[in-house]
């Protein structure tokens, strides 16, 4: 089959302004799945990428790696999916399939990983993301949606969800007897709270915004709330947490936060501050604490979507039309969203382009 034309929304330069673009999707390979995109979440990474804040953008750039839709075609070797299946695609669309990382289901660490957008595909072309009408993906990187999982509220789990689920699983912060802190209550943080409660853990939200206390406790189900700028509250929480999932992308003092951990406690970074972080060695060494990082998750971690469906874990979203996407980006830059924008691709992309 010949390549297929698809509708997309692309940034042409570092202004980040998104406008219609007709893109080409590769012909369907024997191992490929073709997906009609119905929803795509807006991740903060999309904003960084379209504005070239990470200095690696290739324009035109079509962002989006929180994709949900339905299968319209499957290659002859595909065994897991058929037409009509509800599916999603996260941050990756392919890898080498043969390295140690791939063999362990850790494709996110494959030296040859191909990301969903702004990455070089195996044919040398640049990948385009989910702000588009359809996508062609190797079946290994397609996630089946359980019937109980709505596509719009489930789409953000393919990035935000896996980003917090994977380190909680890997670092043992998924045990009912443990106490986890969630630093930051945004797109990542609110999902981390929900997963931690699904694991049966005690959850404390740590935030610089006192106004989020009621939201955290009453709407999201956190057990406690600590204002990071309140010395009394921070002192009261000192040494109480087994781990902290740090979702904040701002540059903040790390030593007071490490003080909240018990001896042998772990802080896992999933947010990416623009500037280097100052690490206080004594705060780690004295109580045998660990500071670690985590980058999304491998395909083995997509069991996350089944656990989410079982426990009713979904993202809190604001569904928008494709013609609102630039306004949404402006609002996202100001943290003016509770908690994730999701573009209604299926119903609005065509109208926005025409």
UniProtKB/Swiss-Prot annotation:
Gene3D superfamilies: Medium-chain alcohol dehydrogenases, catalytic domain, NAD(P)-binding Rossmann-like Domain. Pathway: Aromatic compound metabolism; phenylpropanoid biosynthesis. Its cofactor is Zn(2+). Disulfide bonds: none annotated. InterPro entries: ADH-like_C, ADH-like_N, ADH_Zn_CS, CAD-like, GroES-like_sf, NAD(P)-bd_dom_sf, PKS_ER. GO terms for biological process: lignin biosynthetic process. NADP(+) binds at residues 45, 163, 184-189, 207-212, 247, 271, 294-296. Keywords: Lignin biosynthesis, Metal-binding, NADP, Oxidoreductase, Zinc. Its EC number is 1.1.1.195. The keyword ATP-binding does not apply. Pfam families: ADH_N, ADH_zinc_N. Zn(2+) 2 binds at residues 96, 99, 102, 110. It catalyses: (E)-cinnamyl alcohol + NADP(+) = (E)-cinnamaldehyde + NADPH + H(+); (E)-coniferol + NADP(+) = (E)-coniferaldehyde + NADPH + H(+); (E)-sinapyl alcohol + NADP(+) = (E)-sinapaldehyde + NADPH + H(+); (E)-4-coumaroyl alcohol + NADP(+) = (E)-4-coumaraldehyde + NADPH + H(+). GO terms for molecular function: cinnamyl-alcohol dehydrogenase activity; coniferyl-alcohol dehydrogenase activity; zinc ion binding. Zn(2+) 1 binds at residues 43, 65-66, 159. Binds 2 Zn(2+) ions per subunit. Involved in lignin biosynthesis. Catalyzes the final step specific for the production of lignin monomers. Catalyzes the NADPH-dependent reduction of coniferaldehyde, 5-hydroxyconiferaldehyde, sinapaldehyde, 4-coumaraldehyde and caffeyl aldehyde to their respective alcohols. Belongs to the zinc-containing alcohol dehydrogenase family. Homodimer. This is Probable cinnamyl alcohol dehydrogenase 5.
């Amino acid at each position: 089959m010949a390549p297929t034309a698809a509708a997309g929304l692309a940034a042409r330069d570092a202004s980040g302004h998104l406008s219609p673009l007709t893109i080409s999707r590769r012909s369907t390979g024997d191992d490929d799945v073709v997906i009609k995109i119905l929803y795509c979440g807006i991740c903060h990474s999309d904003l960084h990428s379209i504005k070239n804040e990470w200095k690696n953008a290739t324009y035109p750039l079509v962002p989006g790696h929180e994709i949900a839709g339905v299968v319209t075609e499957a290659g002859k070797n595909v065994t897991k999916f058929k037409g009509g299946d509800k599916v999603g695609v996260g941050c990756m669309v392919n890898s080498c399939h043969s390295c140690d990382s791939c063999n362990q289901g850790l494709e996110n660490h494959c030296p040859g990983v191909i990301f969903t957008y702004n990455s070089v595909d195996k044919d040398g072309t640049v990948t385009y993301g989910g702000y588009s009408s359809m996508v062609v993906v190797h079946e290994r990187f397609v996630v089946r949606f359980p019937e109980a999982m709505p596509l719009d509220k489930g789409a953000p789990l393919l990035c935000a969800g896996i980003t917090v689920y994977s380190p909680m699983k890997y670092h043992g912060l998924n045990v009912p007897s443990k106490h986890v802190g969630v630093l930051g209550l945004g797109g990542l943080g609110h999902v981390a709270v929900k997963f931690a409660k699904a694991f049966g853990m005690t959850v404390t939200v740590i935030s610089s915004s006192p106004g989020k206390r009621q939201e955290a406790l009453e709407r999201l189900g956190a057990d406690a709330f600590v204002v990071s700028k309140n010395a009394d509250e921070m002192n009261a929480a000192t040494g109480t947490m087994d781990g902290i999932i740090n979702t904040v992308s701002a540059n903040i003092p790390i030593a007071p936060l490490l003080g909240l951990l018990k001896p042998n406690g772990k802080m896992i970074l999933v947010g990416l501050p623009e500037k280097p972080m100052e690490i206080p060695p004594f705060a780690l060494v004295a109580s045998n604490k660990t500071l670690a990082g985590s980058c999304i998750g491998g395909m083995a971690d997509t069991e996350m979507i089944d656990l989410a469906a079982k426990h009713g874990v979904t993202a809190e979203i604001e569904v928008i039309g494709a013609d609102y996407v630039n306004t949404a980006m402006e609002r996202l830059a100001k943290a003016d969203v509770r908690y994730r924008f999701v573009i209604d691709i299926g119903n609005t992309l065509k109208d926005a382009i025409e």
